[in-house]
Regions:
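N-terminal, motif-rich segments that launch catalysis or mediate targeting to/interaction with membranes
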Residues: 1-95, 100, 110-219
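Short Cys/His-based metal-binding microdomains
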Residues: 103
């Protein structure tokens, strides 16, 4: 029971920011009905069953290639779903897709690698390039490893100082940019995630025939 409670705390820390980022990127482009379904599918990716054995959903444990494949798969599900009556399947797949795309910037060191390339005055978060090819393909790109039980305890304020002392620097506890309390890099991760969410939408706009795209946006 304590394990489930702790994991629930882990999952609840993130939805607020997934919701904000998704609305900021997509609100002008979807009906409210569609947007609510996309957001619901997005935040349900952090449900308890997805916390075990699904590193690809969150880009955890260096599952970079698996996370990329998951995004490609969900994109395929969107296209397949829109060939059938109804839009729900496409909205669910898109919500899942953008959750993983957003987690890429919060759970990998992409932001740190991008900032390391900058010289002079640091750029603003709004200037971050979310898909810089040499960084996406960099051998130095990695994501935080989950070390049980310390990584769970790191999400509990009372245990966080002790957990971080015991966790290695490559742990999720040290590397994640899930919330503002993770420092200034959170703003860069958030900005990159919003840009990536819009990119994924615009990619589908290019891929889908106009009538299918109109169904997808429900506008």
């Amino acid at each position: 029971m304590q394990l489930m409670t702790t994991l629930g705390i882990m999952a609840r820390m993130i939805p607020r920011y997934h919701i904000e980022m998704t609305r900021e990127a997509l609100a002008p482009h979807f009906s409210e009905r569609a947007l609510q379904m996309i957001i619901s599918a997005n935040i349900h990716q952090d449900d308890l069953p997805n916390q075990f054995g699904h590193d690809e959903i969150h880009y955890d444990n260096n599952a970079i290639d698996a996370g990329d494949r998951y995004i490609y798969e969900q994109r395929g599900y969107i296209l397949a779903a829109l060939m059938l009556p109804g839009n729900l399947g496409a909205w669910v797949a898109f919500g899942r897709l953008i959750h993983t795309a957003q987690d890429f910037y919060a759970h990998t060191n992409y932001v740190a690698l991008w900032l390391d390339e900058q010289t002079g005055t640091p750029p603003t978060p709004a200037q971050i390039d979310p898909l810089k090819k040499d960084l996406i393909q960099s051998p130095n790109l990695c994501s935080g490893k989950i070390y049980f039980p310390m990584d769970m305890l790191a999400f509990l304020p009372i245990f966080r100082p002790l957990a971080l002392k015991l966790l290695p620097k490559d742990s999720h506890g040290w590397m994640n940019l899930d919330a503002p309390n993770r420092g200034f890099k959170f703003d860069y991760a958030r900005a990159a995630a919003i840009k990536r969410t819009l990119y994924e939408f615009e990619l589908l706009q290019k891929l889908l025939p106009p009538e299918m795209f109109a169904r997808f946006t429900d506008k």
